[in-house]
Curated annotation (Swiss-Prot):
Enzyme class per UniProt: transferase
Necessary cofactors: Mg(2+)
Protein's recorded name: HPr kinase/phosphorylase
Region (Important for the catalytic mechanism of both phosphorylation and dephosphorylation) location: 201-210
Amino acid sequence: MPKVRTKDVMDKFKLELISGEEGINRPITMSDLSRPGLEMAGYFTYYPKERVQLLGKTEITFFEKLPEEEKKQRMLSLCTEITPAIILSRDLPIPPELVEASEENGVPVLRSPLKTTRLTSRLTNFLESQLAPTTAIHGVLVDVYGVGVLIIGKSGVGKSETALELVKRGHRLVADDCVEIRQEDQDTLIGSAPELIEHLLEIRGLGIINVMTLFGAGAVRSFKRITLVMSLELWEQGKQYDRLGLEEETMKIIDTDVPKLTIPVRPGRNLAVIIEVAAMNFRLKRMGLNAAEQFTHKLADVIEDGELEE
């Protein structure tokens, strides 16, 4: 089933339907728009007919100056069997040749009062968001001090319990158990909860709780950008864990590498506090303050001074 249809765009931006109503369920498969300027001049060799076509003042003014015999042919060539829609900006008058061609080929003709540039920007942003690559990950997403922390790990390791403690400490839950992720651009991952389990948290022995009902609207978020992954795993005796914080591990989600920390779990460790500190430390690193690097530089200076004294 297509993610976006012409009707979705029409409803989202309250566009006026002029003609071609039978095609309002046509699928839109790409976020790129087309301004068919060259096509108005008769050059259709590389016409991107699978895109939404946007006609502004420039295109319509040029079209009106064409000879009558060419107008109908231009519009028939513009309205193909796979063109999702033709949108006119600025409430421009609709050429009768366009109405006739759209009815003949079932291409919706829509109109907006917005300026062409603004309409282009809004349409592109909406389509990129809706058509972005998506995936789903088993885990918990929490907003901790403004950092989107994705908590992952095997079932039963304590992800939901940790999220509950974080919510009690004033942070905000985004999703539990299943996190739906979409890649809005090259380095931006947005996580959200499936509608069925939004604001819900499952705690073993307690059952399902509604976080918004228990803790208020300030304890939840609808979506959050994922900037840090925390992997919880049971403590393995003999396994070496990072103790300085110099090793930078990443996790690939869709096409984006996200910084990842592995936290060993065992009785007595307060995971909520560790995640809070990890989020604050992550923000400090992005500001250029790295405690681990400062320590190694100081250690190197001490060693160097000791060697000089000898």
